[in-house]
């Protein structure tokens, strides 16, 4: 049993160089003490969160951010740190009261550029010390991301423009500046968690010689359109990439608006010429094309591509084309490097003529791979390593040895920096940072197991199981089955600050995490099966996993818990589990599919998955109120509740709301009111239905949260409600 308290002396020493610069509002590492080795929600929120590592130009120092949380102040704050490549000489560079983000080294390593308070700033760096901050931009709309060109003559930055398709009263009458209303005549007027009053845009400006302002900045997309660059809601500076010549910029953009935007995923790769202002399309059709990245010599451009328009979970392919930057820009024919690779590509990183990337694989872990331009792909991380590795942020070569600098995490610990060493004698890893050792070392260990469960159609389904500390198979434990969101995702070794399975196990629960149909680590066939079959085989997969666990003599009562599609699954299983589960928790779940179709924002998702399509194009077809059973109002809508497709009709007829008369098990419904993906009325409707069926039920609504619960105090309350519910129905 580990209850050793490691003092914060090491962390305090790293702050010595900047303690005289502590800003008002600064949030530092927690000195929390754990009682009896049991992890708590408070301990989870106390963990430092590492992000955005960057290697110095000389290859010796890693720059990274760490965010700490104050529950009392109800916020988090990120500051900058450095350490040597081997993890030694950890230094804290900033101690600001507001978060620092997007930190980057200057080309010679003498400065660090970063965003602070919505503007680009710089500070001199020398011998582990950061000098006085200087603001480089004055952009009234603010800056959320940037990338400096290789020769440091130009900078790309992300800001925003007003969305003229969504009007407010003050737009037509300035005297109505206190009136609050939104007026529109087109989709999409809101996205994820916000009304689309602004549109993200990317600009190019001179760098270094003068202050960056709107007056000396050029909008890459030009004027007279409302296209997004980068794509909302998750896109950032990774959607733009400087060419080595510091003149050309590759970027990803979906050049659509209105209803076409709402039904299509057709983003394409373009190259912008900073000198001529011209743009060349590298791709023109299909689904998402994202994350462009130039090779170091500028002779190749790579990106991630989905083949089919409208299918946001299509296989993420590694694409490449030849390019020439001599006297302008020319591009060759795009090609997929390896069409036989049956998993999704993420995080492409060039090193010479090789590309490193990460991918979720059949062991239900995220592994690192290396590809050459001939299409050969080799797995770098070992199959017996139960970690999720991110793509490397740097590759160091010395003779025949290769060192990948990256980050990793597991079900047992959050993100840390790590080095993966590749030698002829074998591959090994060594952890660089130990940001949370002073907290994790106070906790009792939980154990894990990977098992295969037979499904109703005699396939083998991988499941992770976590066991509580000091697990004893002669005793009886309450258990929790995790029903996954997505629906296209994977229960891997990823750490979560919301659904933290180690925290769950440390409360005395056995936790099973099935990778049912629709998960992404087991090939495209396994993933695609779920589209058009929400009430079908994947629900049977969950029942198979639950029955497998309940067959063990050490398992007592069992809960079913999930968010998003997992919330839908909880609502669905409430009506079909035949007494398998003793309570349910549904967070941000779909209760009524027909209602959701008319209120969600990303129509492409519901259109594809509800109709089970295999091909799609948003282009307008026949118009009219009835269309052809698939086309309505000029749009192909095979997944609509008014479509005549067999899969769509089955889908809506089998909505969880159709099964409420079979509900008989206690259920907790949780929802955020700023959730525009699955609006909060879904949670209210499910709770109301449970009440009307006489089922013990509880509703928790967060007025200021979206699909996720992000504010620290709300997160703490969310955890208390979840564990109070589990304890009430499984332990008492």
Question: Predicted segment positions?
Answer:
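Conserved beta-propeller blade repeats
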Residues: 47-62, 97-113, 140-155, 189-195, ...
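Cap/lid segment of the alpha/beta-hydrolase catalytic domain
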Residues: 433-557, 563-564, 598
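Short, solvent-exposed loop/turn segments at conserved positions within beta-propeller repeat blades
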Residues: 72-78, 115, 194-198, 260-267, ...
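Short loop/turn segments that connect beta-strands within beta-propeller blades
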Residues: 84-88, 124-129, 207-211, 273-277, ...
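Active-site-proximal cap/loop segments of hydrolase catalytic domains
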Residues: 513-732
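Predominantly five- to eight-bladed beta-propeller fold
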Residues: 26, 77-78, 160-212, 217-223, ...
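C-terminal motif of bacterial Sec signal peptides marking the signal peptidase cleavage site
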Residues: 15-17
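Beta-strand-rich domains and repeat architectures in extracellular enzymes and scaffolds
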Residues: 42-78
